[in-house]
């Protein structure tokens, strides 16, 4: 936890991590914990890197595979992310987060991507032709206003997913069975 505290303070956490690994060189949970804190502070690239380190140290740490998969999905690396989530679920078939994530990804197989400017809009193929142009216009308008207001431009592309069934999305992402 000391390494995580230092990480959250943007301090050098490596000496604390090295100390923990000196006690147990296969302590993947160290980097899985760092991945968790990177995730909740919206540092997906760092979360993925930490999760990879956790998996390298402790290959059967299934929650680290899930953390890696979720981070990769957030980064838009869908195939690699799905593979990591599948590996997590194969190792721990009782993990509801892994199961629900795989169900959600399955429900998105028929989605079509529309790229416009800094945005990637994903919607059901049956609705994409109708929704994507309106969504793109709204997103570009909102982005212009928010970029000016907050003086921040997100690194693109920004992915927006449109679901026809809000209840399914909500169930898959936010709840347990």
Predicted regions and their residues:
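Canonical positions in the second alpha-helix
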Residues: 19-20, 53-54, 87-88
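Juxtacatalytic substrate-recognition/specificity segment
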Residues: 15, 111-177
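Canonical tetratricopeptide repeat
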Residues: 1-2, 33, 67, 101
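Helix-start (N-cap) detector for alpha-helical repeat units in TPR-like alpha-solenoids
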Residues: 28-29, 62-63, 96
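Residue-level signature for tetratricopeptide repeat
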Residues: 5-6, 37, 71
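Structural motif corresponding to the intra-repeat A-B loop/turn of tetratricopeptide repeats
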Residues: 7-10, 41, 75
């Amino acid at each position: 936890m000391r390494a995580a505290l230092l990480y959250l303070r943007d301090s050098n956490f490596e000496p604390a991590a090295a100390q923990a690994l000196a006690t147990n060189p296969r302590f993947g949970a160290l980097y899985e914990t760092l991945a968790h804190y990177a995730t909740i502070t919206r540092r997906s690239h760092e979360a993925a890197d930490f999760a990879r380190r956790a998996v390298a140290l402790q290959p059967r740490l299934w929650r680290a595979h899930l953390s890696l998969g979720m981070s990769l999905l957030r980064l838009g690396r869908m195939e690699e992310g799905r593979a990591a989530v599948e590996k997590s679920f194969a190792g721990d078939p009782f993990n509801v987060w892994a199961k629900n994530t795989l169900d959600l990804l399955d429900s998105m197989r028929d989605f079509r991507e529309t790229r416009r400017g800094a945005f990637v809009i994903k919607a059901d193929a049956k609705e994409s032709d109708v929704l994507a142009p309106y969504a793109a216009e709204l997103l570009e308008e909102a982005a212009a206003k928010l970029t000016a207001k907050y003086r921040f431009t997100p690194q693109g592309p920004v992915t927006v997913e449109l679901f026809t069934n809000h209840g399914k999305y909500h169930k898959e992402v936010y709840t347990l069975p």
